Structures are given as structure tokens and as C-alpha cells.
């Protein structure tokens, strides 16, 4: 522990002295990130070479895949096409709650309409809702 503290104190003092004498390393121009422009240019060139190599490898792989597809008569999968899973389903397609409610209303209307009871059903509905509202007013949870 004592050795570490001594190195820190001596090192800091030594850095101050050399900095004061102008012995700092001014290794050329620095960019915003603190790197030489040559290093940045070399890194960009290396990245471009890597991307080009990757593109060529992917082309070769695709050519190989296409050869296999041709050999075994396999169709290429299209990513944009959505799969239709309804044909493998045991039951029919599911209906939304709105579709079910519409069917129920259509059935009710047709039976009631056939019997000529639409006016009586509407009266019964209004009386039931009025009674419900009246009863709801008596209970504390209905307010």
C-alpha cells in the first residue's frame, strides 16, 4: 500500500515537471476523438474491405444455395409472404366478438321479425332498463 502511494506521488510530480518543460508528446494532429487522421483513414479502409469481403462471401453462399435448390427442386421461401395456417387447422376460422354479436342480432331480428313481435320486444327492453335503473338507485354501489 505504501509503495503504491509513493509511486503515485512521485509519478504525479514527475509528470508535472516534464509537462512544465514542454516534453509532452505532441504526436501530430489529433481529430475530435483524439486519434490521428491516418489511423482513422486506415480503420475506415479496413472496414470497407471487411464489408466487401462479407458481400462476396454472401454472394457465393447464395449461389451455392441456389444450386442446391435447383438440384432438389426446392422453392425459395419468400420472406414477405405471410403463411396461411388456417388450412392445417382442425376447426374453422375463429370469429371475432363483433362478428358473433352481429350474427346473434341478425338471428334475433329475423325470428322476432318473422313473428311480428318487434314492438313488444322493444317495449320490454325499455321497461327492463328502466326497472334496472330504478333498482340501481337504491343500492349504494350503483351510484
From Swiss-Prot:
One of its GO terms (molecular function) is SNARE binding. Residues 40-71 form a coiled coil. The keyword DNA-binding does not apply. The keyword Coiled coil applies. Keywords: Coiled coil, Cytoplasm, Exocytosis, Neurotransmitter transport, Transport. Pfam families: Synaphin. It is found in: Cytoplasm, Cytosol. Residues 23-33, 44-71 have a biased composition (Basic and acidic residues). GO terms for cellular component: cytosol; SNARE complex; terminal bouton. Residues 15-71 are annotated as: Disordered. CDD domains: Complexin_NTD_CPLX_I_II. GO terms for biological process: modulation of chemical synaptic transmission; regulation of synaptic vesicle fusion to presynaptic active zone membrane; synaptic vesicle exocytosis. Positively regulates a late step in synaptic vesicle exocytosis. Belongs to the complexin/synaphin family. PANTHER family: COMPLEXIN. This is Putative complexin-1. It comes from Caenorhabditis briggsae. The gene is cpx-1.
Amino acid at each position: 500500500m505504501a509503495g503504491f502511494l509513493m509511486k503515485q506521488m512521485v509519478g504525479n510530480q514527475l509528470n508535472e515537471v516534464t509537462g512544465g518543460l514542454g516534453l509532452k508528446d505532441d504526436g501530430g494532429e489529433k481529430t475530435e476523438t483524439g486519434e490521428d487522421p491516418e489511423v482513422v483513414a486506415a480503420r475506415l479502409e479496413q472496414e470497407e474491405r471487411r464489408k466487401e469481403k462479407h458481400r462476396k462471401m454472401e454472394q457465393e453462399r447464395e449461389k451455392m444455395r441456389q444450386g442446391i435448390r435447383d438440384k432438389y427442386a426446392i422453392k425459395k421461401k419468400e420472406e414477405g409472404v405471410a403463411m396461411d395456417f388456417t388450412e392445417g387447422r382442425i376447426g374453422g376460422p375463429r370469429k371475432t366478438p363483433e362478428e358473433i354479436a352481429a350474427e346473434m342480432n341478425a338471428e334475433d331480428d329475423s325470428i322476432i321479425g318473422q313473428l311480428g313481435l318487434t314492438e313488444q320486444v322493444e317495449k320490454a327492453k325499455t321497461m327492463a332498463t328502466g326497472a334496472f335503473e330504478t333498482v340501481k338507485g337504491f343500492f349504494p354501489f350503483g351510484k
